Amino acid sequence: VDFSRFREPKRAVDDLDLGPLVETHMTRCISCTRCVRFTTEVAGIAQMGQTGRGEDSEITSYLGETLDSNLPGNIIDLCPVGALVSKPYAFTARPWELTKTESVDVMDALGSSIRVDTKGREVMRFLPLNHDGTNEEWISDKTRFVWDGLRRQRLDKPYIRENGKLRPATWPEALGKATEAIKGASTLAGLVGDLAPVEAAYALKDLVEGQGGIVECRTDGAKLPAGNRAAYVGTATIEDIDDAEAIMLIGSNPRVEAPVLNARIRKAWARGASVGVIGEMVDLTYEANHIGTDATVIGDLLKRDHSAVQEKPSIIIVGQGALTRGDGAAILAAAQALAEDLDPVEFLEDL
């Protein structure tokens, strides 16, 4: 008699369809509910839960729907048994085959700490690195899954346009053509993409200034005062959100523009902080007081008595939506004046 054989019915669970990013192997699930707690408490969406009791219990999504958030990729890292894995990365490489490089995310203004795993010359995946000062242990789905876009439509060699068509060229030939064009040009303009490295941007800056040109660094037409860097850099840090009792959002939608920052604001809100919004009211993952949509609201706030608020740690976050308006410079100046009036309120220009 074989006493070691398990003769009871074995537990089997159907896999879930959580969308194109997260692959599921639910027979591995041990019902630890880490994924449920993350989506509910950190991401702020109630789309996962546990049904049944005992051996019939299983983790599932609400009505079998896919996850609708900018952060659910983090449940891949949280799952202790491999029931939730990255669908784009699955079965493409082994961890010991990868070269691991620490880097900084450039998909939003938060600057999350990440690890880039490469195999040969190909980027295979991005993983979060713990950094309490910025992203804690989370990254957005845009950051986590943008790597596959780095493989396609890449320029592998320089090209020269002749008779309206591009033809491949060598680097010496391309640089020679560029030198001739620059020497014979009366005006020179240079454009730098969002994903260009700092070294390349600095080299272009030296080139333009060497030709007597004017350098202007501005993101998406933001009305930033070039002569007063302190006006837009701000005095607050990301960590200060954890201690803030009042948070003001001006022209910002952090849930879309910086999901990890939004999760940090939600954590402060859950602790008891109040959140105010100036601008279009957006769908956030926490309750917020909509103060108004017009920029003149900031001026009205300056006229109020702030003695009760001055003793509380507060933060003003100015988003890109406010800075790209025609009156973006005035909004930034008004926000800075409000920050100074609410001393010791801190000022954080974001996104």
Predicted segments with their positions:
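Catalytic alpha/large subunits of respiratory electron-transfer oxidoreductases
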Residues: 25-26, 31-32, 36-37, 41-43, ...
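Intrinsic disorder at enzyme termini
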Residues: 6-7, 136
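Signature of N-terminal electron-transfer/Fe-S-associated modules in redox systems
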Residues: 1-4
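Extended, Lys/Arg-rich, non-catalytic nucleic-acid recognition/anchoring regions
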Residues: 21
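Short, conserved phosphate-binding/catalytic loop or strand-edge motifs used
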Residues: 9-16, 46-60, 222-224
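Generic anion/oxyanion-binding catalytic loop in active/binding sites
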Residues: 18, 61, 163
